[in-house]
């Protein structure tokens, strides 16, 4: 009995305690379940946003999904709570106690569910409205766009690199062009291309009109000349034989024209280049020299003396051209318009007298006139140097004379000159400006071929002094001696009196490989108008298509302080054979100045839109030379 009562007392004592502990456990379990459910929902939502940012979720479906999860969480919490009470082995709870515990725990559960719902529902309610996800999605799209732009930029960069590599391939022998090009250069090229197009159209139309009359006059004059030489011959083929044997003499008579031609019939193209501009008289050929020698002491001539250094033999003697009536005349009157070169330094009056018996040639230098005044040249003292070519062993010079029209009247005699050697010799005249403390400076020169010389008696000639020569090498490449010379006082030979800037260019094209080789050999009369010193110059080459778009570009290295710079740089362009007649080569010479913008000295265009007839003839000669280099001087046009 006592035990029964004691057990009841113990049971009554522990029953409230166990019920309180069970309620506390239930509350903690429910709170933990609600918290875990909310964390699971948050993790699901975050994973859904991170894995599928571009997926368009419907607001109602999202809200329904969250509500179903909430209901499952709320339904699962009481089941778990009831299972806790069923697992109590040591304590038996009455229905009332269980109900009380459930009623006690239900406010806590409701509070926890309310707390969880207060945290979770804002997410689905805010996601459909897209205030926050939109910035996230837009930033991702922007990143994709940015990455795509970066990819495009990398592709564009590779294209630019290929173009740079293309330039390096083009400029295989010279310095490469700078990576960044100024808009001024592009504007200059566009302007020059338009000018060259207009100039090309103008001179081509003029040539087409004069072509027929020139060809007719040439045939008539040639026939008249040949008939004069063959008066005693009755054979029908005499004229043809004379045409072949006296080709040198006939071309020499025509050598006064402005275009350089080749006397020796090396190719059919050169013979086709012989043209007339006036009456076919030997006197004119005498005054106009066969070649225009350069200022460096090496003979550069495209006629009787080729660039190979007098290696070719002369099959004919031009003295047979002179008729008795012409030999009687001692003074030659030459039209002034035929004596005007591209640029002029003055006139030199000389008298030639050759005696075959004594084998002596006496050259009397009478006077010079039309020289630049002191304001333009800086000097007022003059001296003439003469030399007998090709040996250069016999030389002479006059005394120094002053004034704008110095009178010399001095004689120079060349001895041991046999009659058979007269036709293969020439006399070179050079006019120097004499200075006291500095080295003399050459102002102009002229070459007179002795094949025009009278066999007996005196012959008065007025020579037009020119500042620069013009050379055409025909089918033979340029002799190294032409550019390996040592210019006398090259740093002081800038013709401040107004010599025209010129550029010696070599062209060759290989039809098999499609390689167009352009060699910038040397320049002449590059002046620095802004300073009293020789300029620092470099050249730029542009290859343009038929509409003026740039295909390739390159440039030379800088030549510092040289009025007559020697470049000797070759650039190779890849041009297909069918494109050769549609491209234009633009060459521009610039003067580089410190702390100032560059200044263009001049430019020239060759090809489809050549800047002149000389340039067009050079281009055509290159196409017919079959891979051999052809070299010519070109006068630069002002910018």
UniProtKB/Swiss-Prot annotation:
Organism: Mus musculus (Mouse)
Compositional bias ranges of the Acidic residues kind: 174-187
Name this protein carries in UniProt: Synaptotagmin-16
PROSITE patterns: C2 (PS50004)
One annotated Gene Ontology cellular component of this protein: membrane
Family matches, as Pfam families: C2
Keyword Repeat: yes
Domain C2 positions: 344-463, 499-634
Tissues of expression: Highly expressed in heart and testis. Moderately expressed in kidney.
Ranges where the record places region Disordered: 95-191, 470-496
Cross-referenced InterPro entries: C2_dom, C2_domain_sf, SYT14/14L/16
Polar residues composition bias: residue spans: 95-119
Function, as annotated: May be involved in the trafficking and exocytosis of secretory vesicles in non-neuronal tissues. Is Ca(2+)-independent.
Basic and acidic residues bias spans: 142-151
């Amino acid at each position: 009995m006592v035990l029964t009562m004691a057990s009841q007392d113990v049971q009554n004592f522990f029953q409230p305690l166990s019920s309180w502990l069970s309620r506390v456990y239930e509350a903690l379990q429910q709170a933990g379940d609600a918290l875990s459910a909310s964390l699971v929902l948050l993790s699901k939502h975050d994973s859904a946003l991170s894995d599928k940012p571009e997926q368009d979720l419907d607001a109602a479906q999202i809200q329904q999904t969250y509500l179903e999860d909430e209901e499952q969480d709320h339904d699962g919490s009481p089941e778990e709570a009831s299972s806790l009470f069923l697992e109590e082995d040591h304590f038996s709870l009455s229905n009332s106690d269980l109900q009380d515990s459930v009623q006690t725990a239900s406010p806590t559960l409701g509070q926890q569910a309310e707390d969880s719902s207060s945290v979770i529902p804002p997410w689905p309610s805010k996601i459909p409205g897209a205030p926050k996800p939109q910035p996230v999605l837009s930033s991702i799209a922007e990143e994709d766009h940015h990455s795509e732009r970066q990819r495009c930029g990398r592709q564009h960069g590779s294209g630019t690199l290929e173009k740079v590599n293309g330039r390096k391939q083009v400029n295989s022998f010279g310095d490469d062009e700078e990576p960044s090009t100024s808009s001024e250069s592009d504007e200059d090229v566009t302007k020059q291309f338009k000018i060259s197009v207009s100039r090309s159209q103008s001179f081509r139309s003029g040539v087409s009109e004069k072509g027929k009359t020139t060809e007719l006059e040439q045939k008539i004059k040639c026939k008249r000349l040949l008939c004069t030489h063959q008066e005693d011959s009755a054979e029908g083929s005499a004229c043809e034989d004379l045409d072949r044997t006296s080709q040198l003499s006939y071309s020499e008579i025509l050598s006064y024209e402005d275009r350089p031609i080749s006397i020796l019939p090396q190719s059919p193209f050169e013979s086709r280049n012989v043209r007339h501009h006036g009456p076919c008289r030997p006197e004119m050929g005498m005054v106009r020299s066969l070649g225009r020698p350069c200022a460096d002491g090496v003979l550069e001539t495209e006629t009787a003396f080729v660039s190979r250094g007098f290696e070719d033999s002369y099959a004919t003697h031009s003295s047979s051209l002179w008729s008795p009536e012409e030999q009687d005349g001692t003074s030659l009157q030459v039209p002034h318009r035929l004596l005007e070169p591209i640029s002029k330094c003055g006139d030199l009056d000389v008298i030639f007298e050759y005696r075959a018996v004594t084998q002596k040639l006496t050259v009397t230098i009478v006077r010079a006139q039309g020289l630049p005044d002191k304001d333009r040249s800086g000097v007022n003292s003059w001296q003439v140097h003469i030399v007998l070519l090709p040996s250069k062993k016999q030389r002479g010079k006059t005394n120094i004379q002053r004034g704008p029209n110095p009178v010399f009247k001095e004689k120079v005699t060349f001895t041991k000159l046999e009659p058979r050697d007269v036709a293969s010799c020439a006399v070179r005249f050079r006019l120097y400006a004499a200075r006291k403390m500095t080295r003399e400076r050459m102002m102009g020169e002229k070459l007179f071929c002795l094949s025009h010389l009278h066999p007996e008696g005196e012959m008065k000639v007025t020579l037009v002094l020119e500042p620069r020569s013009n050379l055409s090498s025909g089918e033979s490449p340029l002799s190294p001696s032409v550019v390996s010379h040592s210019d006398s006082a090259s740093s002081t030979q800038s013709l401040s009196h107004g010599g025209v800037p010129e550029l010696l260019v070599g062209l060759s094209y290989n039809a098999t490989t499609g390689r167009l080789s352009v060699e910038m050999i040397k320049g002449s009369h590059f002046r620095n108008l802004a300073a009293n010193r020789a300029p620092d110059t470099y050249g730029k080459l542009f290859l343009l298509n038929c509409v003026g778009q740039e295909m390739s570009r390159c440039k030379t290295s800088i030549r510092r302080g040289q009025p007559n710079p020697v470049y000797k740089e070759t650039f190779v362009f890849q041009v297909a054979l069918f494109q050769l007649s549609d491209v234009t080569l633009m060459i521009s010479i610039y003067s580089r100045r410190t702390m100032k913008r560059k200044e263009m000295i001049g430019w020239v265009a060759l090809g489809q839109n050549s800047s002149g007839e000389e340039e067009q003839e050079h281009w055509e000669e290159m196409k017919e030379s079959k891979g051999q280099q052809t070299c010519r001087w070109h006068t630069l046009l002002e910018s």
